[in-house]
UniProtKB/Swiss-Prot annotation:
Full protein name: Malate dehydrogenase
Residues noted as binding substrate in the record, renumbered to the chain: R84, R90, N122, R153
Disulfide pairings: none
One GO process term, biological-process aspect: tricarboxylic acid cycle
Physiological role: Catalyzes the reversible oxidation of malate to oxaloacetate.
Reaction(s) the record says it catalyses: (S)-malate + NADP(+) = oxaloacetate + NADPH + H(+); (S)-malate + NAD(+) = oxaloacetate + NADH + H(+)
Enzyme Commission number(s): 1.1.1.299
InterPro entries with a match to the protein in the record: L-lactate/malate_DH (IPR001557), Lactate/malate_DH_C (IPR022383), Lactate/malate_DH_N (IPR001236), Lactate_DH/Glyco_Ohase_4_C (IPR015955), NAD(P)-bd_dom_sf (IPR036291)
A Pfam family assignment: Ldh_1_N
Top EC class, one word: oxidoreductase
Molecular function (Gene Ontology), one example: L-malate dehydrogenase (NADP+) activity
Length: 325
C-alpha cells in the first residue's frame, strides 16, 4: 500500500520515512517536501535506497514537492510545520502551524479523498481538529499521534525502574499531548499486579519506593528534555508513528492512544480532540475504548479537555478569517 509523508525533510519526517520503508506492508513511500527542499528530499531518497539495499528491503521510494502526488495513498502522515523549541509553549505553535495543516488537509481531501490522515504536527490535539475540519473527512479517518508516544515513555520509565521487560508494563496516558496529559496510574499494572502494590512494598531487594510524581514529570517534560539537548525528537515519534501506520495497514485492531474527536464517549466530553484509547483497523478508528479513572484522573481529564478546547477555539477563529471553510 502507498503511504505519503508531508514534511519529509524535517527530522521527524526523515526518521519516520526510514521506519516505514522497512515495513513489509508499505509498498510505496512518497516523500513530499517544500520546493526549496526538493534537492534535499531527493538526497534523502537516494541515501535511504542504499540503506534499504543493505537490509534487503524492496520498497518503491518517490519524492516530490507536489501535494497532488498523495493520490492513491492509503495513509497520509503530516509532519510539516514550524518545529517546537525547548522553551516554546505548544500553544505558541498553534497559530503558526494551524494555517499549514489547514492548507494541507484541504489538498489531501482533494487529491486523496479516500485516505486516512495521521497528524503529527504540534500542538497535535489542536492540529488534529484543524485537519478534521478542513479535510471534511469522517473523524474515523483523521487522528493525531496524541498520547501514544507519551504512553510508550511511561511504560519505558516504569520498566526501567522496576527492572522488568517493557511488555510487562500495562499503562496509558490520555488527555493532551503536553502539560495537561493524564497518566492513568490507577489502572496501571506490572505483570498483572497493580502498580500501587509495587509502590508501597519492597517486592524485590534493592527496590526504592516508586516516585509517582517524579515519573509523571519525566513523561511531561520528556520532549523538552530531548529538544534542549539535541534540537529535536526524532526516533521516539518515528517509531510511534510506525506503530500506528502498520496497525492500520495490517488491520491489527490494536488499542492505541491517539488524538481523536470526542463525541461524548467519555464523561460526555464533545467537540475537542484528545488522546484516548481507540481500536485501530484498516479503515481507521473503529471505536473509542472506555477508560477507568479515579476521581483525580477524571478531574484532570476534564481540565485537559477545557484547555485544549479553548486553544482550539482561538485557532479556529483565526483560521476562519484567514482560510474560511
Amino acid at each position: 500500500m502507498k503511504v505519503s509523508i508531508i514534511g519529509s525533510t524535517g527530522r521527524v519526517g526523515r526518521a519516520t520515512a526510514l521506519c516505514l520503508a522497512e515495513e513489509e506492508a508499505v509498498k510505496t513511500l512518497h516523500l513530499i517536501s517544500r520546493k526549496e527542499s526538493l534537492e534535499q528530499n531527493l538526497g534523502e531518497v537516494l541515501d535511504m535506497s542504499d540503506a534499504l539495499a543493505a537490509k534487503g528491503v524492496s520498497v518503491k521510494l518517490e519524492n516530490s514537492a507536489d501535494i497532488e502526488n498523495v493520490y492513491g495513498s492509503r495513509i497520509v502522515v503530516i509532519t510539516a510545520g514550524v518545529p517546537r523549541t525547548a522553551d516554546m509553549d505548544r500553544d505558541d505553535l498553534a497559530f503558526k502551524n494551524g494555517r499549514i495543516v489547514a492548507d494541507y488537509a484541504r489538498q489531501i481531501a482533494r487529491f486523496a479523498p479516500d485516505s486516512i490522515i495521521l497528524v503529527v504536527t504540534n500542538p497535535v490535539d489542536v492540529m488534529t481538529y484543524v485537519a478534521l475540519r478542513y479535510s471534511g473527512f469522517h473523524p474515523s479517518r483523521v487522528f493525531g499521534l496524541g498520547n501514544h508516544l507519551d504512553s510508550l515513555r511511561l511504560k519505558n520509565y516504569m520498566a526501567r525502574h522496576f527492572n522488568v521487560h517493557v511488555s510487562e508494563v500495562h499503562t496509558r496516558v490520555i488527555g493532551q499531548h503536553g502539560p495537561y496529559m493524564v497518566p492513568l496510574i490507577s489502572s496501571t499494572s506490572i505483570g498483572g499486579i497493580p502498580i500501587e502494590h509495587y509502590a508501597r512494598r519492597d517486592y524485590f531487594s534493592g527496590y526504592k519506593k516508586f516516585d509517582l510524581k517524579k515519573t509523571i514529570d519525566k513523561v511531561i517534560h520528556a520532549g523538552s528534555n530531548i529538544i534542549s539537548r539535541k534540537g529535536a525528537t526524532e526516533y521516539g515519534p518515528a517509531f510511534a508513528i510506525s506503530n500506528i501506520v502498520t496497525t492500520i495497514l495490517n488491520d491489527e485492531r490494536r488499542i492505541l492512544t491517539v488524538s481523536t474527536l470526542m463525541e461524548g464517549e467519555i464523561d460526555g466530553i464533545r467537540d475537542v480532540c484528545l488522546g484516548v484509547p481507540v481500536k485501530l483497523g484498516k479503515n481507521g478508528i473503529e471505536g473509542v475504548v472506555p477508560v477507568l479513572m479515579d476521581r483525580d484522573e477524571r478531574e484532570a481529564f476534564r481540565e485537559a479537555a477545557n484547555h485544549v478546547r479553548d486553544s482550539t477555539r482561538r485557532v479556529m477563529e483565526f483560521l476562519d478569517e484567514e482560510l474560511p471553510l
